[in-house]
Amino acid sequence: MATIDKHSYAHMFGPTIGDRVRLGDTDLWLEVEKDFTEYGEEVKFGGGKVIRDGMGQSQASCFDTPDLVITNVVILDHWGIIKADIGIKDGRIAIIGKAGNPDVQDNIDIEIGPGTEIIAGEGQIVTAGGIDAHIHFICPQQIDEALMSGVTTMIGGGTGPATGSNATTCTPGPWNTHKMLQATNDFPMNFGFLGKGNTSLPIALEEQIEAGVCGLKLHEDWGTTPASIDNCLSVAERYDVQIAIHTDTLNESGFVEDTLGAFKGRTIHTYHTEGAGGGHSPDIIRACGESNVLPSSTNPTRPYTINTIDEHLDMLMVCHHLDPAIPEDIAFADSRIRKESIAAEDIMHDLGAISMIASDSQAMGRVGEMITRTWQTAHKMKQQRGPLAPDTERNDNFRLKRYVAKYTINPAISHGISHEVGSIEIGKLADLVLWKPAFFGIKPAMIIKSGFIAAAPMGDANASIPTPQPVYYRPMFGAHGQAPANTSMTFMSQASLDAGVPDKIGLTRMVSACKNTRNIGKDDMIHNSWQPTIEVDAQTYEVRANGELLTCEPVTTLPLAQLYCLF
């Protein structure tokens, strides 16, 4: 068999087993664990290349071949880091393995035919589309920002720049819910809306769930009392939807112990569990040790830098309608911003005690930076804490799996949508993000919705080739016409689907019911299920996990930052 040198092979077909890839300008290194392609039998498209009639392409009917194959790509997901070809059929991942023509090649899993499109994945990394589970739907322009960053699913609440939506992730009531469902029908993004959960009687919650929300949100600005918590969770248990909560910063209606008691062991997603984004001061972070709590962070505290504290005070005053002329409002803001718990938050992410990261879009968070902030946190922790067992100095594979799970599979599990999205697995929607390694985590090379390209960097449309400047992110055909509705999904309660809500309000897009939200717990958070005993010193705000002080220094510089954002 003819061979080529390793450098030439990597340049032509991408890395293989044992090869390492640096992610962006971080200190994080990926190492390929398994390669499904076969040396000498790789498929590649182009003039004089393999995927031609009678060579790498068969004569098979379109019914028997994929609509799209991504060739020779490195998959980074919670379950592994492998190199493979990915076959996509009818908008879903059909098979992961070796592509080619079984007429002339052995051991072919994916048959390429005349009806198959090709995306060259050589030298690139593919991840599942990001899931941002803390969205304030304040303006529709957020959707483009999120999509271009690699997010393909947005879960949250809001009705636009209403005062309530600026502060709380709630879409209150059936009328507002229907309007938001209709408004988002034609966007190339998956959606799930959270209704307002703050009430002590069931009827208004039942109406919202039956109207089409995928869950409910309890927010302190609407009054997160023990009675409303108990009532909201009781309704959720009957309807199989998730509850998200922003707890009582001022401890007016109870302390963290009262809130944890009101949960009564029932599953709940705690937003910004460190507390800077809101929650019992100073010790809401204790919730990370509870088996029924699914904790997440929002990205403004990710990671802890020299600017984190200062910018939070200004953000808080605006987002929560506070008045700097009122001393009590200033005290409220000061009570939420604690450097000790923000430092501990970094370490708790690295140890898997906080399971998810989201944005808190335009309400103390940046919708286009969820993925970037996640990898910046991973980089900072490697710099400050070294390899994360069982990793060695050679690669960071386990750390990468832990962190990618925080914005893909774990929010999908938490909100009952992991049967449709959240990972690169057979049968799920082909919501995929391609990255060139040098731009990993900040500038995607392509965003694919259900197997169809929705967004990508693109050059001058009047140029003779696709690459001349100015190159910037633009919507592709998957973002136009009827394509978004046929490649994107809205997640709703089963009760609303049973009631025929999509047809009644004229939705034309795909819909799916969220499910299995009430029989899960922290143990189900992949690579992020640690449940330590958390203690917070009420005077110093120091955080300890199982007796060990959790602290780290803020950093002065970060990767995936100005170097990539000059224009």
UniProtKB/Swiss-Prot annotation:
Broad class of where this protein is predominantly found: cytoplasm
KW Ribosomal protein (keyword) present: no
Annotated positions binding substrate: H219
Catalytic residues (positions): H320
Residues binding Ni(2+) 1, per UniProt: H134, H136, K217, D360
Superkingdom of origin organism: Bacteria
The protein's enzyme class: hydrolase
Modification(s) after translation: Carboxylation allows a single lysine to coordinate two nickel ions.
Keywords: Cytoplasm, Hydrolase, Metal-binding, Nickel
Gene Ontology biological-process annotations: urea catabolic process
Cofactor comment text: Binds 2 nickel ions per subunit.
Residues annotated as domain Urease: 129-567
Modified residues (N6-carboxylysine): K217
Short name of one Pfam family: Urease_alpha
Compartments (UniProt record): Cytoplasm
Gene3D superfamilies, sorted: Metal-dependent hydrolases (3.20.20.140), Urease, subunit C, domain 1 (2.30.40.10)
One of the record's GO cellular component terms: cytoplasm
Cofactor names: Ni cation
EC code(s) of this entry: 3.5.1.5
GO terms for MF: nickel cation binding; urease activity
Subunit relationships: Heterotrimer of UreA (gamma), UreB (beta) and UreC (alpha) subunits. Three heterotrimers associate to form the active enzyme.
UniProt similarity note: Belongs to the metallo-dependent hydrolases superfamily. Urease alpha subunit family.
Protein name: Urease subunit alpha
Organism: Alteromonas mediterranea (strain DSM 17117 / CIP 110805 / LMG 28347 / Deep ecotype)
Lineage start: Bacteria, Pseudomonadati, Pseudomonadota, Gammaproteobacteria, Alteromonadales
